[in-house]
C-alpha cells in the first residue's frame, strides 16, 4: 500500500488574519465603487481611483482623488461611510460583532486575533470589551449627529440628516471625509464652517474622543474622575494627548492665525491642532500656512492618536515611551518610568522599531513621489506623512498625482492602518531564539 506524505496544514497567525481581512474588505469596497450607480454621472470609475478611495476610507485616512460630495452618489457615499465605520472599529471587531449578534461562540483563535486587533492587554474579557466598543461608538456617533443636525438641516434641509450622520461617523473614526464639496468648489472640507463654534467644537471633540482608544474609555467609564485607578497606559495617553493639543494650539494662536477676532483665532488654532491627529478635516487653507506651521503639522500627523483607537500614526504611547527612555538615559537610569511604574524593555524596543519603520516609509514614499512627479520634497513629505499616519490632510496635490504616486499612497495608507508591529509580525512571524550569541559593546553617539 502506497502511503502519501501528509502535509501540515498552514495556520495563519493573528497578524496575518488582520492584514488579510483588511485587504479583502478593501478590494470589495473598490469593486463596489467601480459600479456606475456609485457615481452621480453614472460612469465607471477607473480601478486605481476606486481602490484609492476604498483604501482611504477603510484606513480612515481622508485623502481623495475625487471630491466625495460632488462625484459620488448616495450609494457611493454609503459604501464609503460603511468602509469608514469598518475601518474605524477594525475589520476583526466588526466580524466579531456579527458573530456575537448571530449567537455564535467566539473560538480561542478568534479571541486571540481580537486581542491583537484591539490592543487589549489580555485575552480574558475580550468579548465583553467588543460589546463595550460597539456601545461607546454608537453613543458618540449618534450624539455627534444629533448635535450637528441643526447646523446641517438649516443649510441643506432634509439632506442635512445624512450630512450630520456622515460627518459624525467620519469625525469619530478620524476619517476626514466630507460631503461639502460642489462642482464649483471641490475639496473644501469644513472651511465654510470655520467660524461656527458649535460645528467645529463637536467635530474636534469627536476626533479627540475617537483617538483616545477604547481601553482608555473603559477606564474613564469605570473609574470616572478617579485618575489614580486608571491603568498606566490610560494615564500616559491622557497626559500626552493634552500636551499635544495645548502646545500646538498656543503656537498656532500666537504665530500662525494672528488676524481676525479672538474667537476666530481660537477656533482656527484649536481645530488645526486637533485634526492632524489623525482626522483630515481642515477649517483653514493649509497651503497658505507658514512653513514652520506645516512642519509642526507633519510632526503631529506622524505622532497620531492612541493605540486601540480609531486613529492612526505612530501613536501617543510610542512618543511618550521614547521620551521617557530618553529622560532615563539623561539621568543614567536603567529603566524608563511612568507614574511610579517601570516600563518593560520590550515596549521601548517596540517603540523604537515602530518609529523607525514609520520614518522610513515617510521619507522613502516622499522620495519616490518627488522623483516621479517632479514636485518639491517638502510638499511630498506632507503628503506621505498624511498617508502613512492615515490623516488625510493635503496641500492640494492628491488629485493631480499619477498612478505610480497614487499606488505609493495606497501602500502607505494600508501599512499605516494595519499597524507597524502587525505588519512586522505578519511578515516575519515569531521564532524565538533558543540560544544567545556572545555580547559585545558598540559605541553610540
PLM feature segments, named:
Residues 1-445:
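Membrane-proximal intracellular helices of multi-pass ion channels
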